[in-house]
Amino acid sequence: MKLVLALTTEANQAKAEALAAQLLEQHLAACIALQQQQSLYHWQGRIERDSEVQLLIKTSPEQLEALQIALHQMHSYDVPEWIVLPAECSDGYGSWLTSSLKPPLPKPGDAAEPGL
């Protein structure tokens, strides 16, 4: 079964937990793992070094667009990390993941279900 792993970082544990909670409450992610790390990166002409928290976000391919939009609206960084990796999982894990996510919103132009 297919799933998507999305990576982003936040400035500290509190911000990472708040972002994770919002994404989970909106059922855009089934699980989010948090890990403290040291990051070295280029920013505005300098090399920066910061403690950050990596978020490993597990979601479905169908929820990816809504997740990306929500994450970019909520994120504390001007340019948040957004890396997406396709992945495979067991059928059992995939069933749990799917049941944890809300159905994606219809895209413009998609036909509405009869009776709606």
Give, region by region, the residue ranges found by the protein language model.
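Positively charged, small/polar-rich N-terminal and surface patches that mediate targeting and assembly
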Residues: 1-116
